[in-house]
Amino acid sequence: GIMDTLKNLAKTAGKGALQSLLNHASCKLSGQC
């Protein structure tokens, strides 16, 4: 249903945001930004 679709979208968006946050944090730590 539409709720499932929305849930999946939210999950995917959350994963993407978390991933980019982690990437940014690690590049800051290693001084590669």
Swiss-Prot record:
UniProt keyword list: Amphibian defense peptide, Antibiotic, Antimicrobial, Cytolysis, Disulfide bond, Hemolysis, Secreted
Main subcellular localisation: secreted
UniProt keyword Transit peptide, yes or no: no
Pfam families for the chain: Antimicrobial_2
Compartmental location: Secreted
Tissue expression summary: Expressed by the skin glands.
Function recorded in the entry: Shows antibacterial activity against representative Gram-negative and Gram-positive bacterial species, and hemolytic activity.
Protein family per UniProt: Belongs to the frog skin active peptide (FSAP) family. Brevinin subfamily.
Protein name, per record: Brevinin-2Eg
